[in-house]
């Protein structure tokens, strides 16, 4: 049906274009038909030796006075003339000249008679009545009708949203009276606390008496906050499916368009429709696009966005109450939202959707592995242990990549090899071609083993999981460490261990090859340790300056809604002391890394030879070889090093 409608519209537009072209052509020929036909014929019928040209009316009068004009033919109600002349200037050769006669030159015929010039006036052709009607009446009507039709049906005017300009103020929210998203609470794992909050909302909608009997009121709004990929939108899909009430869904960016006032009008229209369908749920995804703090950032506020936000605040909890409308918002930038939007009465609850813990990852992997044939050697528990810091979206992508790899290798089930390769692709990037056995490859091997050795002998660092010389992404070599589950609290020794391990690659280069052979491969390592050491001094109070927070985490974020006055506020001498303390920390850690490399010089050579032979070495094999030469402590905290 849509195809037929599109064909009809296309045919109509083609017809309008053709009719307009025909009428314009007809009108053009009608206006200059005489000079384009009769006078043109006269010119074309002149002897080839005759000079043909155009002449101004003033020059024509000069020819007349000089007696050089022989004959004149008048056309188009004396608006055009074909003049036969001969001029001594051109050797008295015959000339056929076209002259445009200005309006009001009524004395021309008198002058021709006065100079005894042979002339003839040719009557204008009768205009076709159909052409007259078509050009003067029908064409403007067709043009206006076509313009109105296009204006009302064009998707381009509606900001690409499929709306006509006549309905720009209408809400673009998708409405489903009985939504079937295909997602239920059974399909959600790893975020049990958030799921419990939403199950309570569903229970309130289905059994309100159970809550109202004790004086409870249903929350007006729930704000989902968390990193990308943790399942905020998935929760919204689940509540839409489970609540069995009308559901509106819209993105925050869909409110504001190029026209002033559209955003506020769409908010009003959305809540009007929601009130008519109450009880219902309104889901606003990426609400930070419209709910950003007012008047903040460079250049102050944006009037259109702030007007939209003001309307949203009024609709959620203003003078007029929208009973039975539950607003669910989702964002990963709650820190930049306007305070008025976050207060109780608008968003009564803020549900934090964190990255899943180990048990949560196991549950998520089980959900996404339902329709995938896994080999007997695949352990979801081991995979969950290996992937701390992965979001639900990351885990879903990991199993999907493993399934794609199994298909590529023409296997009927997903084995451990595909799962491991998929994890490596997500963490490090797509594998490149193996490097040739050159000096650079040996240097990279020592660099990566330097990271692994320093990280392994430090008690506050974590276990090595894998060392590889296979290029991935922009890295020539990689050393993976298995992170601990809880990274929210890091001790000073743990931070120093990170810096020492990061500098271990450069330390190995200097010890093995000498200071003149130290390469640029540790450039990203130096950036990491400088940033970490600076945070130890300015944010964590882990230096001789004392327990002072000299810099805020959001410093420099003015374009994201931060305050212009939130920069660093300390004297120049304090800035010099900060630089000195950062330098002291990095120098100490680098000396410690060199010391560790020197103490383990023999085993480093053995491990490098094994690594060059195998390209990849797992953590167990590495520790087994290392433990024969040194005593390894118990492990604690995370890090991944890259050689660029």
Curated annotation (Swiss-Prot):
Its main location: plastid. Keywords: ATP-binding, Chloroplast, Hydrolase, Membrane, Metal-binding, Metalloprotease, Nucleotide-binding, Plastid, Protease, Thylakoid, Transmembrane, Transmembrane helix, Zinc. Residues 33-128 are lumenal. It is a multi-pass membrane protein. The chain crosses the membrane at residues 12-32, 129-149. ATP binds at residues 226-233. Residues 1-11, 150-644 are stromal. It is found in: Plastid, Chloroplast thylakoid membrane. The keyword rRNA-binding does not apply. One of its GO terms (molecular function) is zinc ion binding. Its cofactor is Zn(2+). GO terms for cellular component: chloroplast thylakoid membrane. The active site is at residue 448. CDD domains: RecA-like_FtsH (cd19501). SUPFAM superfamilies: FtsH protease domain-like, P-loop containing nucleoside triphosphate hydrolases. Its EC number is 3.4.24.-. Binds 1 zinc ion per subunit. It is an enzyme of class 3 (hydrolase). Zn(2+) binds at residues 447, 451, 525. InterPro entries: AAA+_ATPase, AAA_lid_3, ATPase_AAA_core, ATPase_AAA_CS, FtsH, P-loop_NTPase, Pept_M41_FtsH_extracell, Peptidase_M41. Pfam families: AAA (PF00004), AAA_lid_3 (PF17862), FtsH_ext (PF06480), Peptidase_M41 (PF01434). PANTHER family: ATP-DEPENDENT ZINC METALLOPROTEASE FTSH 2, CHLOROPLASTIC (PTHR23076:SF139), METALLOPROTEASE M41 FTSH (PTHR23076). Homohexamer. Acts as a processive, ATP-dependent zinc metallopeptidase. In the central section; belongs to the AAA ATPase family. In the C-terminal section; belongs to the peptidase M41 family. This is ATP-dependent zinc metalloprotease FtsH.
